[in-house]
């Protein structure tokens, strides 16, 4: 049996990606749909598919994030979990580093180095630009997919990219 995989990138500008067994993809912006619309979207995906499974990014508070943005992340994640449960769609919470480790390859990596002081030594620390690296991965894996939020946008939407790559992670892991 072939499954439909859903990748959910929570956040105010998050995205939902549905990857169907026939090779079709659907993308929905969280900020352009209210909770009821997202519920209808998930219900519609489930009604059109024999088997559906979802991956929801397991986001946590970031060190530099404000309390308000952390609360908003948690609220949206909770709403998405509730909608998945209400629609009886099984889901897996996945840490960003886990799906990134599965999807990224060395050629995708955008790396810089910053100097940090440890004790009395200066050392160079490797810093991966996660957004650019994910964009490179999506371009490599899905060259036919428009990664912009919509046709009017000029820039690639990293939230859409992440939700697409999470759906691919679910497919690879056969979750």
Q: What does each model-identified segment do?
A:
Residues 1-175:
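Phosphate- and other anionic-substrate recognition elements at nucleic-acid/protein interfaces
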């Amino acid at each position: 049996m072939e499954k439909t995989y859903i990748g959910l990138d929570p956040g105010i500008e998050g995205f939902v990606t549905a990857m169907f067994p026939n090779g079709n993809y659907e993308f929905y912006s969280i900020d352009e749909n209210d909770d009821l619309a997202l519920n209808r979207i998930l219900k519609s995906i489930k009604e059109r598919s024999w088997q559906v499974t979802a991956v929801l990014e397991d986001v946590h508070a970031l060190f530099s994030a404000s309390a308000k943005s952390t609360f908003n992340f948690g609220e949206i994640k909770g709403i998405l979990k509730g909608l998945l449960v209400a629609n009886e769609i099984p889901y897996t919470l996945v840490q960003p580093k886990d799906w990134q480790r599965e999807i990224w390859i060395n050629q995708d990596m955008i790396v810089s180095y910053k100097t940090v002081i440890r004790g009395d030594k200066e050392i160079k620390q490797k810093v991966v630009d996660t957004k650019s690296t994910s964009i490179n991965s999506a371009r490599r894996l899905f060259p036919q997919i428009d990664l912009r939020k919509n046709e009017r946008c000029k820039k690639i939407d990293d939230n859409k990219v992440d939700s697409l790559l999470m759906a691919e992670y679910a497919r690879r892991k056969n979750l």
